[in-house]
Every structure is written in structure tokens, then in C-alpha cells.
Amino acid sequence: DAHAAVYEMAGSLMKRQDLFDATKLSPKDVQRYGTHEFGRHMLLARNMLEAGVRFVKVTSYGWDTHGDNFHGHRSLMPRFDQAYAAIIEDLHERGMLDRVVVIAMSEFGRTPRINGHIGRDHWPEAWSLALAGCRMKRGTVVGKPNDLGTFVDGDAFDIGHMFHTWFAALGIDSTKVEYDNHGQPLPIAHDACSVVK
């Protein structure tokens, strides 16, 4: 049943080619989101959510700044801020923000220490993400790094905690157990983790 429902949703989306037609975008919205690629993709994501798409992923490239970190971020950050703020504002104005979780994250953080190429390397020990929507408490900051920014100071949360948190925000029982074809228990979120509060 679930497979058929997803297949039907995909078929419905394929009939909505108008969602992907850049000539139908409002010039005002294009300016608000930004004329750059990330802005266009975030605007498309908003339109897809309005059309009933249940999961949308938008990727922002160029953050792997092993070299020239600071110049790279000077161009990336304003684009991200512009488009992220625009989609949050639009979802709020349309009454959709209480039904949508907006997640801004990377797969890991960056080294606190600058390398020999004036860049930052991969650093999975301490990093951050931003969440909005779905009844999440606004303005909340959970956790912090130590004074050097090298490790988490206090309780650390991993992706297992994040899945519990996202599912809970969406009203999904994150302790539910699914089963694969061989009857092996497969929880939808790691059972050793819990919701971040």
C-alpha cells in the first residue's frame, strides 16, 4: 500500500510540469529568493511543497572549503541567508510552517583550526544545524562546543537524536519498529537515542 501511494504521488508530480517552468516564477519572488542557483532551487522547493510534495531536498554546493575558506564563505553565506529566510517567511505567511520541518545541515563540521591553505578541513566532532517549523520552539539553542570549538561541551547529540526529533515534530512515532523482508526488527530511529528537547 505504501509503495503504491508513493508511486501515485510521483505520477501526480510528473503531471505538474508547470512547477518546474522558470518562466512562470514571479519576478518579485525570484528577487526575494535570489537570482543565484540556490535561490531558484529554494523557490522551486517552496512551490513543490505548496503543490503537496511531502519531501524536498535542496543542496547548496561549495561549502567544502579546504582552501580559501573566508572568500568562499563571503559569497556562499549571503546566498544561503537570503533563500533560507525567504522560504521560512513564505511558509509562515502561507500557514504551512507548522506542517513543514525545514532542516539546514551538513554531514559534518569544519576544523576550528585554519589549515595551510587558509581553509578548514572535515571535523565530525562538533557541528551545528538549524531547524524551523512544526511546532519547534523558536529561538532555542541546544548544546555548545568547548572553548576551542573542538568538541561538544556536555551532552552530545548525533543523527539518531535528530531523526527522533524530526519525526516527533512531524507527529510520527519515532519508536515505531518496521520489519524488513526477513522479519528483522528495523526501528525507524535508533532506539538508543531520543528526542532533543
Range-by-range predicted roles:
Residues 1-197:
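Ligand-binding pockets and gating/stacking loops
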